[in-house]
Amino acid sequence: MLKPLGDRIVIEVVETEEKTASGIVLPDTAKEKPQEGRVVAVGTGRVLDNGQRVAPEVEVGDRIIFSKYAGTEVKYDGKEYLILRESDILAVIG
């Protein structure tokens, strides 16, 4: 399993099927980049200038909204993940 370092978070992107108001399903090339995911691994947190470590605010299993162009896409063990910094997370759903 991937173990992120520092303030990095590993997420599995949640793909949603997009339809227009009239019911037409959009092809992948016309879709917006997804911004929703599920946290699968969390780093140990960021370190402040004084050396104090701040624990991440998200936990494994959280559903999140993240910045549109954030993170690095990686493929591991046949699955695609996104590794991003905690600061790229905009909100936790629910």
UniProtKB/Swiss-Prot annotation:
The keyword Magnesium does not apply. It is found in: Cytoplasm. Gene3D superfamilies: GroES chaperonin. Pfam families: Cpn10 (PF00166). GO terms for molecular function: ATP binding; metal ion binding; protein folding chaperone; protein-folding chaperone binding; unfolded protein binding. Disulfide bonds: none annotated. GO terms for biological process: chaperone cofactor-dependent protein refolding. It comes from the Bacteria. Keywords: Chaperone, Cytoplasm. The keyword Magnesium does not apply. One of its GO terms (cellular component) is cytoplasm. Heptamer of 7 subunits arranged in a ring. Interacts with the chaperonin GroEL. Together with the chaperonin GroEL, plays an essential role in assisting protein folding. The GroEL-GroES system forms a nano-cage that allows encapsulation of the non-native substrate proteins and provides a physical environment optimized to promote and accelerate protein folding. GroES binds to the apical surface of the GroEL ring, thereby capping the opening of the GroEL channel. Belongs to the GroES chaperonin family. This is Co-chaperonin GroES. It comes from Geobacillus thermodenitrificans (strain NG80-2). The lineage of its organism: Bacteria, Bacillati, Bacillota, Bacilli, Bacillales. The gene is groES.
